[in-house]
Amino acid sequence: MIPGIFLSLPDLRCSLLLLVTWVFTPVTAEIISLDTENIDDILNNADVALVNFYADWCRFSQMLHPIFEEASNVIKEEYPNANQVVFARVDCDQHSDIAQRYRISKYPTLKLFRNGMMMKREYRGQRSVKALADYIRQQKSDPIQELHDLAEITTPDRSKRNIIGYFEQKDSENYRVFERVANILHDDCAFLAAFGVVSKPERYSGDNIVYKPPGHSAPDMVYLGSMTNFDGTYNWIQDKCVPLVREITFENGEELTEEGLPFLILFHMKEDTESLEIFQNEVARQLISEKGTINFLHADCDKFRHPLLHIQKTPADCPVIAIDSFRHMYVFGDFRDVLIPGKLKQFVFDLHSGKLHREFHHGPDPTDTAPGEEVQDVASSPPESSFQKLAPSEYRYTLLRDRDEL
C-alpha cells in the first residue's frame, strides 16, 4: 500500500480557506495614474481608455473615486486583456500641463480615448458603477451593422445619416480603416457594411464608401479618396456626419454650451423642414467663414418653449431666428429676411462688434438714423440668456472659471 499524505484538521481548514478565497476573489483592476512621462504611451496603446481628470480637493472628484474604481473592476472581468479597456486618471493639480493640453475646465471630467485619439464627446452620464460599465460596453460594441441582403442596401433608414461601405472582404486594410472611423463617429452617423457577393453590384470600380443623407431627395455621395488613408477617410466622413447646422436637444445642450461659442438658432416646428432647409442653405452661403466663432443650431419649438418665452415668442410665431450670447438673447426679425443677401451675415457681425448689445441698451446707433430724423436715446434691456442654464452645473462639477461672455 502506497502511503498517503494526510493533512491535519487545522491545516486542511486553512487550505480550504485559501482555495475559496482564491476562487471567489474578484479581479482588481488598477487605475493607472497618468503623467507627462507615460500618458502618450498608455493612451496610444489602449483600444479604449476612460480618463478621470480630477482634483483631490474637489468633493465631486472624491465622490467619484470609489465608483470609478469599482466600474474598472467590473469591466476588467469582462475585458481582461491589458489594452482592451484602460481606466486611468490625471491629478490636475500635480499635472496642470496635461489639464491645459486637454482644456479641462471642470472637475471631474471624464474623457474617452480610442488608440490615443480623444473623442469629442466626454462622458456626461450618471456617476454610478452600472452606468459607467454600460457606457464602456457600448463603446466596445461593434459600431457597424453588417448587411446580408441587397434589399437592406437599397432601403436603409433615410431618417439618419448613413455611411455604407462596400468591401470585397472583411479582412482588408480598407475595412480596418473604415471600422476605425466608425468607432469614432458612430454617435453621429449610422455605419453599415456589405461584403463579398452581397456588395458585388456596388463594387464595379472596387471597394467604395457611399454617404446617403437624410431624406429621399438628396443624392448619394461617393468617397473618391484613398480608402487606406485614415486622415482622408475620417475627414470626408466627419464632414458628412457632423452637419454645419446641428440640432440642439436637452441631451446635448451641456456639451454644446461648453464649446463656449454663441448660438445662432433657428426655432422651428419639427415637421417644418422647409424653413430648416432655407436656414441651412443661407448659413452655408453667408456664414461658412464664421464656423469657428459661432455655433449654428436648430431647435424644436415645442421642446424649447421656455427660450421662446424669453424673447416674447411662442411656437405659433415659429420659425424664429435668434442669437444667444450666453448673456443675452437677440431676435433676428422677420424670418423671410434671411433670404436677403448678407442680412444674416450682418446680424452675426453685429453680435461680434458689440452693436447688438449696444443698441439694445442705448437705442439705434447714430449712423443707422435716417437724415433729419431726431435721435432718441431709447434704453432697453435685452432678454437674459436662456441656454446658459444648460451649461455644466455647479451641483455636479467644480467649475474652474467663468466664461467670458459677450
Curated annotation (Swiss-Prot):
Gene Ontology terms: biological process: protein folding
- Per the UniProt record, which residue ranges are transmembrane? none
Chief place of localization? endoplasmic reticulum
- Per UniProt, which keywords does this protein have? Chaperone, Disulfide bond, Endoplasmic reticulum, Signal
Please report, in chain numbering, the residue ranges of the motif Prevents secretion from ER: 403-406
Give positions of region: Disordered.
Answer: 360-387
Could you tell me where this protein is found in the cell? Endoplasmic reticulum lumen
* SUPFAM superfamilies per the UniProt record, alphabetical: Thioredoxin-like (SSF52833)
Signal peptide range in chain numbering: 1-29
Question: Where are the annotated segments for Interaction with ITPR1?
Answer: 236-285
Listed PROSITE patterns: ER_TARGET, THIOREDOXIN_2
The annotated subunit structure for this chain is: Forms mixed disulfides with both ERO1A and ERO1B and cargo folding intermediates; the interactions with ERO1A and ERO1B result in their retention in the endoplasmic reticulum. Directly interacts with ITPR1 in a pH-, redox state- and calcium-dependent manner, but not with ITPR2 or ITPR3. The strength of this interaction inversely correlates with calcium concentration.
Q: Which PANTHER family match?
A: ENDOPLASMIC RETICULUM RESIDENT PROTEIN 44
Q: What is this protein called?
A: Endoplasmic reticulum resident protein 44
Origin species = Bos taurus
Q: Which gene encodes it?
A: ERP44
